[in-house]
Structure formats: C-alpha cells, structure tokens
C-alpha cells in the first residue's frame, strides 16, 4: 500500500477494503489456522440473521503447552472467547471484537466507517461502533488456532498495545453520543475494556499495599487490615479458577486447568504493561508495537 501515516493495521485494512467486491469480508492474521468449515459457518450465520454485521470465531492457542506463560495465555483466551464473549452476546450487549477471525457484512462495515486507522485495537473499537449503528455482533463455534506469545518481552509488547488501544477506545466511545446501544453499550464498554484497563493498573499495587499493610500489622506498626481486604483478592482468584473449568472444557484443552494455579502471578505482568501503554498513549499514541511470531515449540496438526 502507499506509504502514509499512521502505519497501522487498520490503516492497511481500510486501504484493502476499497478493493473488496464481495458481500462478505473476513480478517485473518498470517499465522492463523482457521477451522476448515469456519467460512461456511460464518456465511450461514450472517445470512440467517439480518441484525448481524459481524460474527467472531473463538481464538485458541495451539502452543498453550510450551511453557507457563503460554498456558496462562491460552487459559485467558479460553475464558474470554468461550465464556465472556458468548455471555455478552446472549445478553444482547456489544462485544469487543478480536483482532482476527472477524467475518463482516461489507455493506454494514462500510456504513459504520470501517476501522479507525488511529486506534491500535481497531477490532475492539469496531465492535462498539457497529453497535452504535444498531447492528449486532455474534459468535460462531469453529475456532481459529493462533500462536501465544512465548516469553515475557513479547507478551508485554503485545499486551501494552492492547491496553493502549483499550484506553483509546474508552476515550472515544465513553462520550455520550459514541457509546452505542444506550445504557447496554455503556455497561458492556465498562465491563470489558474499562474493567480490564483498571485492573491492569491496580492489581500489582493493590497486592503490594495489602502485603505491606499485613507485614506492618504483624510488626505492631499499625492495625491489621480488615477481613474484606484479604477476602476480595481471594474471591477474584476463586471466580477465575471456577471460570477456568468450563472454559477449558469448551476449548477442548483440559490441561489448561493447571494454569489457574499461577494466574494470580501471571496477572502481575499486567501492571508494567499498563504503565508502558500509558506512556505510549501520551508520547506515541499511534505507534504499533509489533508481536514476534514463530517461536512456538509446536504447530497445529
């Protein structure tokens, strides 16, 4: 494509959309392994429901067993794509689309303005923008296999871009006229992107504060923390662990359940990624932090 800023994936997608001649369009990443019947199932779902502008296929990681990071990443995907997004769809709420395996009705995609070229999570933004136009996004069953990041450096680069994009989407979509779908759209926006960004910033500092408070109390420096201060993180961990059971079953990957044991440690990585995302939002808001691929120990069969 011709060189032009911003040099982002959505900018390239908008350029390619000009040449689309069909009634449907699908987005795949180069390293994806979609299920053989996914395109047919997506086309049938879109044809059967005129309210749908897009359907999202669940994303699963083919290298979830490489190491503890990939296993936690794969479990995170399983919960998101097999539990959380289907729940939002059943409730009739807008969903943040994933960055791949989106199947669109081209006329509705164009009517919504296609992708925001300045947003580095153009997929999440587009899900809410389609809802603002009165259309819905659905889920289909055939999955797409993709590669989980295999080390912390790659994970942080990818996650910081996601968090930066979520903040961009919140800054734009949180305006009253932009949320889409009224109170339902605002609820979904806050419960998905808003809660994710907030927890990324607060999780590690909150645990550090609680640990310092408990240590100081044990030394007699100050009173002990109230019981709810201990109960709250335990409740969050318990909910995540309980969610892992049906998510791993639906992803046909029972081995992912082990990752529930170290998810509380895995979540600590979110805070430095969030700090890096905030710095980039201020200094390099449209810079695309690329993710390295090809490091997986295994490939789909």
Per-range role (PLM):
Residues 2-23, 36-120, 160-171:
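Long helical/loop segments within the catalytic core of UDP-sugar-dependent glycosyltransferases
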Residues 29-33, 115-118, 130:
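The conserved acidic donor/metal-binding loop of glycosyltransferases
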Residues 99, 138-139, 145-157:
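Catalytic cores of eukaryotic secretory-pathway lumenal/extracellular enzymes that build
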